[in-house]
Each structure stands twice: as structure tokens, then as C-alpha cells.
Amino acid sequence: MTYRIGELASKVGLTERTIRYYEERGLLESVKRLDGGQRVYTDDDVRRLKFIQKLKVLGLSLAEMQELETLYGRHHTNAKVLPRLIELLDAHQRTVNERLSELAALRDEIRAYRQHVSRRLAEAK
């Protein structure tokens, strides 16, 4: 099936501008154009955009996504892409775990300070 950019945008929940931007950044390769220059997208582009959205939710940057696209473009197989994706996901998971530890410490500090302030308030009465 083929889609014009507006149809594709509606289907994947992105703006037309975002789709064009991803194309400019090289995340959408080989987009076909009609004689008038109008872009035409396929189901492969739908899958690619959903994959990009998933990677974005998981915390990957556009530069990291471009790196994966470059690997795929160079080798035309996922054999090199998937191990690198696992490395990136592992790194992001470590970052999330560090942030969770920091947030847990902050939560404990807020709780302790709130108790301190509550005691001071009770003493003042």
C-alpha cells in the first residue's frame, strides 16, 4: 500500500514536518516521489517510523538512530545492527538505573526534611 505524507502522518501519529525531518536526517531512506515531486510512502516506511518512535521512547537519540541506519545501509542486514542496538539499550538501561537511584535518594531526603519541618512546626505550637 502507498501513502501520501498526510496519510502517513495520520497513520503513525507524527506531523508531516517530523516525517520530512527524519527523511532529511537519513532515517527514512529511498522515499519515492511522483512526477510532481510529491512523496509517496510504503508499508516499509510505516514500519520504519514505528521503529523510530519505539527507539525514541526507549531514549535513543537521533544520532544513535542514524548510526543504526548507517550500519544497516552499509551491510544491508541486521547482523551488525542488532548487536549495536543491544549495546545502546544496555547503556540507556544503566543510565535509567542511575537516575532511579538518584531519585530514590532525593525522595528519601525530601521525606526526612519534611519530617524535620513538621517537628519544628509542632514544637512552635
What are these regions (language model features)?
Residues 26:
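Glycine-centered, phosphate/nucleic-acid-interacting loop/turn motifs that mediate DNA/RNA or nucleotide
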Residues 17, 39, 86-87:
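Generic secretory/membrane-interface signal
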Residues 29-36:
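Beta-hairpin "wing" of winged helix-turn-helix
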Residues 1, 5-8, 15-18, 35:
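Short glycine/proline-centered loop/turn elements that form peptide/ligand docking sites
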Residues 4-10, 29, 43-125:
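Arg/Lys-rich, alpha-helical DNA-contact motif
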Residues 36-43:
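Minor-groove-contacting beta-hairpin "wing" of winged helix-turn-helix DNA-binding domains
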